[in-house]
Amino acid sequence: MRSLLILVLCFLPLAAPGKVYGRCELAAAMKRMGLDNYRGYSLGNWVCAAKFESNFNTGATNRNTDGSTDYGILQINSRWWCNDGRTPGSKNLCHIPCSALLSSDITASVNCAKKIVSDGNGMNAWVAWRKHCKGTDVNVWIRGCRL
């Protein structure tokens, strides 16, 4: 029994933190946090970006070929925006640990996204937004939601 407990405890750190949001649940949270029309981008843009970046999963991580990693519901990159302790030359422009972006509480992700979108490139900073959302009817992502 004791060895089983030790085995279980060994695997606990491997469990991904975070939450998979529902579409409307995420839209409501993002609206509460001031993303609707932030820097001219409607709420639908943000929900669409989250869908194609992480499939609404706050615990999502993706390693890039340059050695950096994208974190959280909006896949914020460790080269520029957060510190994961393993990306050489990280700028950490949001002044946060990347682990904060994996929380079920999306406050850190939203606050950092506001800095990113204000940096000059707007939402073009997100590849998935450029590929799947830009120039499309993003209102479909909030249609039917009680906001």
Curated annotation (Swiss-Prot):
Subcellular localization, as worded in the UniProt entry: Secreted
Name of the top EC class for this enzyme: hydrolase
Every C-type lysozyme domain range: 19-147
Signal sequence interval, chain numbering: 1-17
EC number in record: 3.2.1.17
Superkingdom field: Eukaryota
Sorted UniProt keywords: Antimicrobial, Bacteriolytic enzyme, Disulfide bond, Glycosidase, Hydrolase, Secreted, Signal
PTM annotation: By an evolutionary shift in the site of proteolytic cleavage of prelysozyme, Gly-18 became the N-terminal residue of the mature protein instead of being the C-terminal residue of the signal sequence as in other birds.
Recorded GO CC terms: extracellular region
Cystine pairings recorded for this chain: C24-C145, C48-C133, C82-C98, C94-C112
Predominant place of localization: secreted
Reaction(s) this enzyme catalyzes, per UniProt: Hydrolysis of (1->4)-beta-linkages between N-acetylmuramic acid and N-acetyl-D-glucosamine residues in a peptidoglycan and between N-acetyl-D-glucosamine residues in chitodextrins
PROSITE patterns, per the entry: GLYCOSYL_HYDROL_F22_1, GLYCOSYL_HYDROL_F22_2
The keyword Phosphoprotein is annotated on this UniProt entry: no
One GO MF term attached to the UniProt entry: lysozyme activity
Active site residues of this protein: E53, D70
Gene3D superfamilies: 1.10.530.10
GO annotation terms (biological process): defense response to Gram-negative bacterium; defense response to Gram-positive bacterium; killing of cells of another organism
Family: Belongs to the glycosyl hydrolase 22 family.
Further information: Lysozyme C is capable of both hydrolysis and transglycosylation; it also shows a slight esterase activity. It acts rapidly on both peptide-substituted and unsubstituted peptidoglycan, and slowly on chitin oligosaccharides.
Protein task: Lysozymes have primarily a bacteriolytic function; those in tissues and body fluids are associated with the monocyte-macrophage system and enhance the activity of immunoagents.
Quaternary assembly: Monomer.
Protein name (database record): Lysozyme C
Organism this protein belongs to: Phasianus colchicus colchicus (Black-necked pheasant)
